[in-house]
C-alpha cells in the first residue's frame, strides 16, 4: 500500500528487481495512494526502490502454499524483513481478545459468515493511516472466533478517488451471502465531497 505526497506534477514510483529478470516498476502518476500487487517467485531475492515522495504504509506476501491457515506474511517496509506477529501484538496497547488489524484504521465489521471450514470477517479499513479515510475491506479468517488469521484486502475504493483529496468514498457497509460457488459480497459504494450533501452518491 503506497501513498504519494501531494506535490504538483511529481510522479511517484516503486521498482522491484531480482537478478536475471526485468525489473517491475509501478508509477503512481496522479494517484495519491494505491494498492500495488506485484508477482514474485519463491526462492528469489528481490530489491525494492522507490522515489523519495512515496511512502509504504504496509507490505505483505500472500498466496502461499496454505493461505487460509497461514494468512499473509507482513513485511517491514523499511528493510523488507519478516514481522514476527507474536511480538507485534503482545503490547499493552493492543486488544488481546478481539480482532485488530496489523496497522492503521479499522471500523465496522461486515459480511460475517461461515464458508469452507472458516469463519470469515470482513471489515472497513484504511490501510494507509490511523484515521478514517477512503474505505477498503480487510479480511480475516478463524476456526474458533478467537484466533484470527489476516488475509489480503478484498475490496478497494473506486480508482477515481485515488487522485482526489477533496472527495471521499470507497467500500462502505455491506454483508455476505454464502452460495455453492463462493462468498458473494453486497456493499454500499460511496462517492462524494468531504462533507455529505447533494453531490454524494451511494
Positions of PLM-derived features:
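Carbohydrate-active catalytic/glycan-binding domains of CAZyme proteins
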Residues: 1-202
Amino acid at each position: 500500500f503506497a501513498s504519494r505526497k501531494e506535490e504538483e506534477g511529481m510522479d511517484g514510483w516503486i521498482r522491484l528487481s531480482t537478478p536475471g529478470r526485468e525489473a517491475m516498476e509501478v508509477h503512481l502518476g496522479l494517484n495519491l495512494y494505491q494498492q500495488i500487487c506485484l508477482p514474485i517467485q519463491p526462492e528469489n531475492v528481490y530489491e525494492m526502490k522507490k522515489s523519495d515522495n512515496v511512502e509504504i504504509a504496509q507490505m505483505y506476501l500472500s498466496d502461499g502454499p496454505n493461505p487460509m491457515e497461514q494468512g499473509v506474511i507482513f513485511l517491514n517496509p523499511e528493510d523488507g524483513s519478516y514481522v514476527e506477529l507474536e511480538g507485534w501484538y503482545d503490547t499493552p496497547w493492543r486488544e488481546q481478545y478481539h480482532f485488530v488489524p496489523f496497522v492503521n484504521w479499522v471500523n465496522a465489521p461486515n459480511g460475517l459468515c461461515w464458508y469452507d471450514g472458516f469463519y470469515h470477517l470482513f471489515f472497513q479499513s484504511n490501510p494507509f493511516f490511523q484515521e478514517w479515510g477512503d474505505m477498503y475491506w480487510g479480511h480475516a479468517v478463524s476456526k474458533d472466533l478467537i484466533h484470527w488469521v489476516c488475509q489480503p484486502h478484498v475490496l478497494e475504493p473506486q480508482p477515481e478517488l485515488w487522485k482526489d483529496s477533496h472527495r471521499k468514498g470507497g467500500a462502505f457497509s455491506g454483508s455476505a451471502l454464502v452460495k455453492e460457488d463462493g462468498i458473494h459480497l453486497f456493499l454500499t459504494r460511496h462517492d462524494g465531497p468531504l462533507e455529505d450533501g447533494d453531490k454524494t452518491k451511494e
